[in-house]
């Protein structure tokens, strides 16, 4: 007869815990107990064969209990709309009971059935305020697009060189578009009017720093600034331009220019194979996002 060990029969509950009821066999009979995950911030690894009940026994209790405790959740529903439907039910239920924090909303991002999806634009100055943030965004994006690639497999140093080059180049493009002709907006997403004055020497129009609710209107404080073309569709389209066009455009930003050194050197020396290795890697992976659905979702 299979025997197990004595397990916890007390419910260890706190404001962050997830408590899952269970049954176990001990000393000849089935007993009731609790699986108490008292510190979910340490991470929970769920392992089981397909159809073993991972979602029903672990994931769904997490959704139910964390929703009731006012947690913000990001749920990857690989069998949409199974989990999304249950999550929405608990969201509405707890909202009615006053357990959902004020301002908390329910949104879906769906790259297949876009009629269910909200639009989202992660390429904004409020998220990317310096080159370090742009590099982090670029690295995260490329790692996500390479999720099928085996870690540690490959050509070692040369692969790492091309990977780092791809990250740097994408970071340069992201930071350029984040800051190019930034425009002010209010908290409701309404575009405001930024006053400009013509420089008598260069004849270029430069912002004065004064923002109004409309031309000639009242002076206001913008909620955020957004680059004129600051979104993924414009960046992805820009990556498919000729190398000469790309370099000429990016060179106009003094902060971005230093990142372009290795690429410009390869281009001027006509080392096209090296250039394709550096930028071609980026183009191949980002091409996965070049769909009508992705463009609609990521458009500002």
Regions found by a protein language model. Give the residues of each.
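N-terminal pre-Walker A segment at the start of P-loop NTPase domains
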Residues: 2-35
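P-loop NTPase motor domains
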Residues: 23-31, 35-300
């Amino acid at each position: 007869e299979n025997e197990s060990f004595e397990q916890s029969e007390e419910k260890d509950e706190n404001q962050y815990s997830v408590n899952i009821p269970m049954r176990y066999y001990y000393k000849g009979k089935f007993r009731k107990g609790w699986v108490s995950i008292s510190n979910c911030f340490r991470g929970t690894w769920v392992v089981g064969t397909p159809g073993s009940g991972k979602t029903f026994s672990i994931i769904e209790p997490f959704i139910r209990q964390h929703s009731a405790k006012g947690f913000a959740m990001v749920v990857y529903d690989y069998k949409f709309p199974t989990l999304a439907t249950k999550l929405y039910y608990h969201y509405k239920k707890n909202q009615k009971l006053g357990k959902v924090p004020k301002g908390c909303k329910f949104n879906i991002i769906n790259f297949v059935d876009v009629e269910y999806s909200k639009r989202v634009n992660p390429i904004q100055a409020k998220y990317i305020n310096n080159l370090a943030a742009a590099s982090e965004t670029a690295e995260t994006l490329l790692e996500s697009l390479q999720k099928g690639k085996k870690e540690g497999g490959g050509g070692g140093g040369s692969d790492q060189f091309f990977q780092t080059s791809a990250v740097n180049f994408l970071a340069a493009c992201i930071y350029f578009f984040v800051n190019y002709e930034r425009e002010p907006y209010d908290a409701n997403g309404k575009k405001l009017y930024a006053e400009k004055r013509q420089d008598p020497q260069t004849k270029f129009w430069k912002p004065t720093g004064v923002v109004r609710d409309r031309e000639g209107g009242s002076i206001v404080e913008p909620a955020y600034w957004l680059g004129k073309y600051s979104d993924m569709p414009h960046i992805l389209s820009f990556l498919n331009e000729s190398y000469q066009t790309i370099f000429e455009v990016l060179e106009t930003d003094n902060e971005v220019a230093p990142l372009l050194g290795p690429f410009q050197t390869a281009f001027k020396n006509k080392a096209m194979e090296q250039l394709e290795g550096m930028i071609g890697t980026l183009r191949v992976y980002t091409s996965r996002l070049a769909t009508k659905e992705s463009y609609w979702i990521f458009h500002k």
